[in-house]
Regions:
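Intrinsic low-complexity, intrinsically disordered or marginally ordered coil/linker segments
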Residues: 1-236
C-alpha cells in the first residue's frame, strides 16, 4: 500500500488558526483527529468490516431469483440485477476482486444474510459497504493520522491508502476564516496533487499525471530524503 505524505499550509489570523488546531489536534499528542472533522456514519460504524465480500455474496445468492430457496424473499429480477451490477462495479473499481461476487455462492451462510443486506444498503447510501472502506475513501486510511512534522502554520502527516482530500475539504468548510493549501504525494510520484481552499470553498485543485515532471517535483519536496539518497547513489 502506498505511503502518501500530506502537507497543510494554514493562513489567517492567529486566533482563527489556533481555533482550528484546537478543534482537531489531540492534546499532548500531534495527531489529527479525523473523527472530529468527518465522523464515520453511525450505520457504518456499527457494522463489522471483515468478510464484506462473502457476506454480500451470500445475501445476493439468497435473493437471486435464479437460485434455490434459501428462506429469504427473492428480489424482482430487475432490482437484483441493479444491486448485482452495483456491487460488481464497486469491487472492480476498488480492489479488482469483482470476480469474487457471483450471486451464486456455493454454500451461503444464513448468518451472513442480515449483514450482507446492511452492507449493500450502506454501499448505496455512503459509497462503501463497511467502515473500513469508508475510512480509506474519506480519511485516506483506517485511523487518525500522526503529524510527523510541524512548522509555523504548517503540518505534515502520513496517510496509507489515499490522500485525505475529503477530510481536509470538510476541515476547510468548518473553518472558513482560514485559508488552507493541501498538497500530497506518494513516493515515486504516482499519486500527486493539491487543493486550495478559501472561505471554506475549494477554489483550485491540481491532479498531476503519474510520474510527470510536476509529480516528481512535488514528490521530491515531500520526500526530500529520497532525493538525497538518489544523489548519494550517483556520487563516484
Amino acid at each position: 500500500m502506498h505511503e502518501i505524505r500530506n502537507e497543510l499550509h494554514l493562513s489567517g489570523s492567529q486566533p482563527n488558526i489556533e481555533k482550528l488546531i484546537n478543534s482537531v489536534v489531540t492534546p499532548n499528542y500531534p495527531m489529527i483527529d479525523f473523527a472530529r472533522i468527518l465522523p464515520v456514519p453511525d450505520e457504518l460504524a456499527s457494522l463489522p468490516a471483515g468478510m464484506s465480500r462473502v457476506k454480500i455474496d451470500c445475501y445476493l445468492t439468497a435473493v437471486n431469483p435464479g437460485t434455490a430457496d434459501h428462506h429469504l424473499k427473492k428480489l424482482p429480477a430487475d432490482e437484483y440485477d441493479r444491486l448485482f451490477r452495483l456491487v460488481k462495479e464497486y469491487y472492480s473499481n476498488n480492489d479488482g476482486f469483482n470476480h469474487c461476487i457471483t450471486g451464486s455462492y456455493p454454500y451461503p451462510d444464513v448468518g451472513y444474510f442480515a449483514d450482507g443486506k446492511r452492507m449493500i444498503d450502506c454501499l448505496q447510501k455512503y459509497g462503501a459497504p463497511n467502515w473500513g472502506d469508508w475510512c480509506d475513501q474519506n480519511w485516506g486510511q483506517l485511523t487518525n493520522s500522526h503529524i510527523y512534522e510541524i512548522e509555523y502554520n504548517k503540518w505534515r502527516f502520513v496517510t496509507t491508502a489515499n490522500p485525505s482530500i475529503k477530510v481536509i475539504g470538510k476541515l476547510a468548510e468548518l473553518n472558513p476564516a482560514v485559508r488552507i493549501y493541501h498538497r500530497w504525494a506518494s513516493l515515486g510520484g504516482r499519486i500527486v496533487g493539491s487543493c486550495l481552499y478559501e472561505n471554506g470553498q475549494l477554489i483550485a485543485e491540481q491532479e498531476c499525471a503519474p510520474f510527470s515532471e510536476d509529480a516528481i517535483s512535488m514528490e521530491e519536496a515531500l520526500f526530500p530524503e529520497s532525493r538525497a539518497d538518489y544523489c548519494e547513489q550517483q556520487e563516484p
